[in-house]
Amino acid sequence: MMTCLFVNGYAQRGLNLKDLNYRSREWKMIVRSSPDSFLTTPLARQFAENVLVWQRNTGGWPKNEAIHRPLGGDIELILADKNKRNDSTTDNDATIIEMTYLARMWHAVGDPRYKEAFLKGLRFMLDGQYDNGGWPQFWPENRGYQVHITYNDDAMVQTLRVIRDLRDGIKPFDGLVDESTKALLDKAFHKGIQCILNTQIKVNGKRTVWCQQHDRETLAPAAARSYELPSY
């Protein structure tokens, strides 16, 4: 309830031109390109509150949402979807970008809720890894091609980058996890790299390329949508 009041309170306020300039930008660009000085502003805090609202109880986030836009009357609908288990994903930078913003905001203002939400996202990330080291496109619930190990749109590679940077303490992912968690991250990272090696397509005994998706059991190239054939 406090989050709702916080977000709605900001939504009712007038926005200056600088605020409007930020809101007109793509969410990914705000997260990746905003200077550290922006992160201590009220608008940056509002964006962080939106990130908390959008986080599913799975720990992940849905894709293709302009999370920095005012929530307004949509907030009740968003909160009603908190328990959805079939739209948390790393496709199109979802979850990755929200975790990055929370990490930056935690360093900037020290709000413990941002770290808590980040770690919840990390648990979602680690729980999604298959025993063979790969990740599906959506989890914990998925169907059809969503179950495949997914390289498309850098989904798995971005996940591995976050895991590596957390393990190695690379900004903005420094200081967020303890040594025991870093050991888990190291294991997950090496499993992921081994999966990449194991899914590399061999032609006449020579290692070549990868498909966008690979079967989670056989590791063979797999189809996705009707126009996304298992080509390479």
Cite the ranges covered by each PLM segment.
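Bacterial Sec-dependent N-terminal signal peptides
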Residues: M1-Q12
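Short coil/linker segments at helix-helix boundaries
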Residues: N142-Q146, P172-L184
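Carbohydrate-binding/catalytic loop surfaces
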Residues: I67-R85, P136-D154, K206-S231
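Short loop/beta submotifs within extracellular cysteine-rich repeat domains
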Residues: G59-W61, H107, G133-W135, I170-K171
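Low-complexity, Ser/Thr/Pro/Gly-enriched N-terminal "stalk/linker" regions
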Residues: R13-R85, V203
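Long, well-ordered core segments of solenoidal/helical folds
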Residues: Q46-G60, A117-G134, K187-G205
